[in-house]
């Protein structure tokens, strides 16, 4: 019954707004005009306010609060920078305009022409000389209210239901300024990384999203069909193999901010559609790339937050270089006491069983080690830690280690208990690369549907010759979570994937 009353109230409010819309139109007022000339935004106007000068301004925004007092009214508008108070007097705007103002609601978008002044309470405001309705809102927005309870500020009627916030992100952005702040920081993070890379002379490129063969990661793809060519295509799971082709083609450094797609589970760290930036630099190796990551992450955190410190999942985390380095074998030994070096697949499977892990019998040695690491080590690595020198089975695209047989030159950066980025000294020997991909193909035949496939065109490119190269992939969504302190990937993606309503 309570839900029905709430719905009835919403219907009544919407009907009243539809009636107001009709009344405005009957009065010759277009509730949806084409444009309005804005001369300044709220933050800019407040920052440049001068006590001894009445500056003429034209501002626009959404009405977020109204206080009517007979022949005068105060209301707040919200624009992309913040909020600003508007003062409106009936005697100055005229009877007709003030009557129109009475038809406006919270949520309507207006433009105001006037001059700046400071109220008796000290608030910098705009004294309206005229206003114009720019958009009549037909659906009421949820507006949080505040009151003091025993000396503490209490917020109620807030738009706080998480799933509803994700489904109606447009409303979330209107009423929750901290959400807007997170996405502004996300944009700043991407901009800083892009500037960092381009300042080195590296080229930003674009590679195919629809691919005839998927590769570059161990993951299940989304499939689609090209009608004209009558062929199956895949949404990319990574852009690695195409970027390496560009290194073969003669570029010394390339990077791409890419939407990648993996047909896998959804949780607070995984979304089927996510953003990565991948970077490939010729004549460098994974040790050089570790130093670059340290510099990049420290600079990015400072650029966005003003400090290299961040708080994530209740932990104070420092992104100040240098980061700890630990081989994957040493990390498993440190956190479980188990030894993985030199172990056969059967021995690793028994080891995992002794540790209490239930494993899919179809996976091989690399996946077993990955499961052990993911269960017992990764969640405990809170401060940024480079995990290095992985077994060959775990990294079919990485170069053999120069001094440790059976291992490859690879690192993952773990921070806050999750992988943030992944890097190799890239394998450029086409003979070894073919062997590795054929081994992956045999794992697929055993039933491992995340194993890679043999990409003959990529192998052909390597046969022309690729210089020594360092590669890096950074999960942008997770990096944003780390720097902003958000605890779910859904809070850093504007429109995360959800089950149907």
Curated annotation (Swiss-Prot):
Protein residues bound to Mg(2+) 2: 419
Entry superkingdom: Bacteria
Gene Ontology molecular function: any one: magnesium ion binding
EC number from the UniProt entry: 6.1.1.6
The keyword Metal-binding is assigned to this record: yes
UniProt-annotated location(s): Cytoplasm
Keywords assigned by UniProt, alphabetized: Aminoacyl-tRNA synthetase, ATP-binding, Cytoplasm, Ligase, Magnesium, Metal-binding, Nucleotide-binding, Protein biosynthesis
Cofactor list: Mg(2+)
Gene3D superfamilies assigned: Bira Bifunctional Protein, Domain 2, Nucleic acid-binding proteins
Keyword Aminoacyl-tRNA synthetase: yes
UniProt: Mg(2+) 1 binding residues: 412, 419
Catalytic activity: tRNA(Lys) + L-lysine + ATP = L-lysyl-tRNA(Lys) + AMP + diphosphate
NCBIfam families linked: lysS_bact (TIGR00499), PRK00484.1 (NF001756)
Subunit structure: Homodimer.
Protein name per its UniProtKB record: Lysine--tRNA ligase
Organism: Chlorobium luteolum (strain DSM 273 / BCRC 81028 / 2530) (Pelodictyon luteolum)
């Amino acid at each position: 019954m309570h839900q029905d009353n709430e719905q009835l109230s919403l219907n009544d409010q919407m009907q009243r707004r539809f009636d107001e819309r009709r009344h405005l139109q009957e009065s010759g007022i277009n509730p949806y005009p084409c444009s309005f000339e804005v001369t300044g935004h709220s933050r800019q106007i407040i920052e440049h306010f001068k006590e001894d000068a009445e500056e003429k301004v034209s501002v626009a925004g959404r009405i977020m609060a109204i206080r009517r007092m007979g022949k005068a009214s105060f209301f707040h508008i919200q624009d992309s920078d913040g909020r600003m108070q508007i003062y409106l007097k009936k005697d100055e705007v005229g009877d007709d305009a003030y009557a129109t103002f009475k038809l406006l609601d919270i949520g309507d978008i207006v433009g105001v022409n006037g001059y700046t002044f400071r109220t008796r309470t000290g608030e910098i405001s705009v004294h309206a000389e005229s206003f114009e309705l720019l958009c009549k809102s037909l659906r009421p927005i949820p507006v949080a209210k505040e009151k003091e309870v025993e000396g503490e500020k209490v917020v109620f009627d807030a738009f706080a239901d998480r799933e509803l916030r994700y489904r109606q992100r447009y409303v979330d952005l209107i009423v929750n300024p901290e959400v807007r702040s997170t996405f502004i920081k996300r944009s700043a993070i991407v901009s800083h990384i892009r500037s960092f890379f381009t300042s080195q002379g590296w080229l930003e490129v674009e590679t195919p999203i629809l691919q005839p063969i998927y590769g570059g990661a161990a993951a299940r793809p989304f499939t689609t069909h090209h009608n004209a060519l009558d062929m199956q295509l895949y949404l990319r799971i990574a852009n690695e193999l195409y970027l390496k082709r560009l290194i073969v083609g003669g570029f010394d450094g390339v990077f791409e901010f890419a939407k990648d797609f993996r047909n896998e589970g959804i949780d607070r760290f995984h979304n089927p559609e996510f953003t990565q930036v991948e970077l490939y630099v010729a004549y460098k190796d994974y040790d050089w790339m570790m130093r670059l990551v340290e510099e990049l992450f420290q600079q990015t955190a400072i650029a966005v937050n003003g400090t290299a410190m961040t708080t994530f999942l209740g932990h104070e985390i420092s992104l100040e270089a240098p980061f700890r380095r630990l081989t994957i074998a040493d990390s498993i030994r440190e956190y479980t006491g188990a030894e993985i070096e030199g172990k056969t697949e059967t021995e690793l499977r028994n080891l995992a069983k002794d540790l209490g892990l239930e494993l899919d019998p179809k996976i091989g040695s690399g996946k077993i080690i990955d499961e052990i690491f993911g269960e017992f080590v990764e969640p405990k690595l809170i401060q940024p830690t480079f995990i290095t020198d992985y077994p060959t089975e775990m990294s079919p695209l990485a170069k053999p280690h120069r001094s440790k047989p059976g291992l490859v030159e690879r690192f993952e950066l773990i921070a806050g208990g999750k992988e943030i980025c992944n890097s190799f000294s890239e394998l450029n020997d086409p003979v070894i690369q073919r062997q590795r991909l054929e081994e992956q193909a045999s794992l697929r035949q055993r039933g491992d549907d995340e194993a890679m496939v043999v990409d003959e065109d990529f192998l052909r490119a390597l046969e022309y010759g690729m210089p020594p190269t360092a590669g890096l992939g950074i999960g942008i969504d997770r990096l944003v979570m780390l720097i902003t302190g958000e605890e779910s990937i859904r809070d850093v993606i504007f429109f995360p994937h959800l089950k149907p309503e």
